[in-house]
Amino acid sequence: CACLVGSEMCIRDSIRARGADRMSSFGDFISLSDVCDKSTALVIKREVSDGVIAPGYTDEALEILKAKKKGNYCVIEIDPSYEPAPIERKDVFGITFEQGRNELHIDDDFFSNIVTENKELTEQAKIDLAISMITLKYTQSNSVCYVKGGQAIGIGAGQQSRIHCTRLAGSKADNWWLRQSPQVLGLQFVDGIRRADRDNTIDLYIGEDYMDVLAEGEWQKFFKVKPDVFTAEEKRAWLDKNTDVALGSDAFFPFGDNIERAHKSGVKYVAQPGGSVRDDHVIDTCNKYGMVMSFTGIRLFHH
């Protein structure tokens, strides 16, 4: 969760960060890059969260957060000027592993090595790809990240194969988009339903287990009016409207199947290290769909 200067921007970005995956953000730990003010604290107060870390808190914000979870909410203040040691060390069963700290710096030339026929990388695409790289820098490998409009919308982390990362992140990106469909926005929930229950209900409604909330005797628990089934054809038609999505990968794509899956979720821009013996196949698949792909030459593994 990122926070910018200014109360309104801070709140907006906090909400967007959590909205990337409403299911996984349940019981999260919130990280803010600026001082937490009263308005942001009020937003955090209503969320199911285990803690927050920020470079500072206003007096009003601190009083609000101190009362959360009956005083057991974890509130951490960090020194924004702190510089970690240049060498990272990890002890595993008596063996010490050392490596240089990840100091990835993304500048205007970071995505300049475009290897596809389409080389039109927009400014928004550069921003989105940069966000994907930053997200991957701190995400358990193997990982893939989908980004749209300055917001991560699907993160697939900790998988044992690249294609499973792409599928997992893609399914989350699809769910993010489906939640904005007319079918979901038009749902009439019963009065007093808790937000977490509403999120879970939507997740079931847009998924394969929709009858869990639409069966007779069940739908009445969640809705005032029984919704129509959100058919596979309707979902596909809505997903096809999601375009200009950016995708980053923390290591190279070994085969073009990752690009095929990414295309189904509206991906147009791709950034990955490159270096696979099948790079030509991956590039050809991107060219088939008119995608723009950059080879960064940098692997972002995090274990």
Question: What are these model-derived regions, one by one?
Answer:
Residues 1-6, 10-11:
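Single conserved hydrophobic/aromatic residue that forms the stacking wall/gate
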Residues 247, 251-291:
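C-terminal structured "cap/appendage" subdomains that terminate the fold
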Residues 22-88, 273-302:
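Phosphate/diphosphate-binding loops
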Residues 172-265:
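Generic long, charged, amphipathic alpha-helical segments
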Residues 117-142:
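Short, basic/aromatic recognition patches
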Residues 142-150:
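Short beta-strand scaffold segments in enzyme catalytic cores
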Residues 88-126:
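Short, compositionally biased leader-like segments
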